[in-house]
Amino acid sequence: MTITITNIKRVGSEQTESLTIENGLIKGWNLPAEGEIFDGQGGTLAPALIELHAHLREPGQTEKEDLASGLAAASAGGYGTVVCMPNTRPVIDDPALVRSLIEKARGLGFARLRPAAAVTKGEKGEQLTEMSYLKEAGAVMFTDDGLTNENARVLRLGMEYAKSLGMVISVHAEDDALRAGGVMNEGPVSESLGLPGNPAAAAAARVARDMEIVALTGARLHVQHLSTARELDIVRDAKRRGLPVTCEVCPHHLDLTDESLRTFDAMYKVAPPLRTRADADYLLEGLLDGSVDCIATDHAPHTRAEKERDLLDAPSGIAYIEIAFPIMWTRFGERLGLEKLIDLMTAGPARVMGWPEPSLEAGAPADMVVLDLETEREVNPAEFKSKAKFTPWQGQKLRGFPLLTVVDGKVAYRRE
């Protein structure tokens, strides 16, 4: 199959060029047009984005999302690869389930699926999974995300097992006892609203503990969704000590704060919770100075009925994978710059995983996205590919929407 994308620009260039793709690989730049031709409309060509943290809800919770809707949403957001979390029903802790998900996703024609598998059976925090068989089946990461690895000894054993396989463990780092019952960040806003708070110390204490387990084992650890300044300081210190630690930040922890909860709207309820503007600004500095390795969304869809419940009862999570890049480009593009932002959403995740960094040179795999960096569009969740057709950014005007996403040399998304 041959595709030519015309009328595009490279990152950092104003020159209009074309790119030809053949049999899943980049054939070259500015060659005679052949095959199916797509007009890039003057957009900027970048490697397809990589998502290390998404909840696709299949199997068992497909009323919230499924592989087809979640991967279609990812493709519409410019993503070429998605690592799905294992906190499904049943939990992704069986090699046969890993293989089944990969095979099903392959036939959908959207973003590439790379399943994460659980560290412990059933994510119960007790008995380790058969990590070697899960890796052989295609699992790319181990995590009990959704739970918090309360048992330090089990986490240590899991990290040692993962290390022997050359794999990374990813952690949702919050202390369950400290965060118990909290529905939002503990601070002046929660106090003024009379809502139970989840203190920043719950996240910081768990990250600090986990850094010591890294020091003990020498195993690679990836810390999910930093939300506080103190967590970032702890990770920075671990990196200065030479520990094999990486971390991610989510757009919602940069753009939204606990002030949003003044509406008592559970759409803003996430775990870890939205923190203060000072925390968000500090995390942005971590992106700028390289302390934070990558951006991930923690795409976590729920049904509208669930998110319309009282704050105390509603589940945590925001789903917005198809507008993640526009949020980051519109809100923080001026501070970060395009090259840095693209790196944080492509090469950064690849480095965390130990994958080859994406390339747009001849011979490289044809995973790419054409981005419209200039045109403002109003966010309309009714147009989302995701089943979660609601978002905190509804009605806001953003720039940076994908025009075309190509995965393995095939069109996975094209904006109509």
From Swiss-Prot:
Binds 2 Zn(2+) ions per subunit. GO terms for cellular component: cytoplasm. It catalyses: (S)-dihydroorotate + H2O = N-carbamoyl-L-aspartate + H(+). Keywords: Hydrolase, Metal-binding, Pyrimidine biosynthesis, Zinc. Its cofactor is Zn(2+). Transmembrane segments: none annotated. Catalyzes the reversible cyclization of carbamoyl aspartate to dihydroorotate. This is Dihydroorotase. It comes from Deinococcus radiodurans (strain ATCC 13939 / DSM 20539 / JCM 16871 / CCUG 27074 / LMG 4051 / NBRC 15346 / NCIMB 9279 / VKM B-1422 / R1). The gene is pyrC.
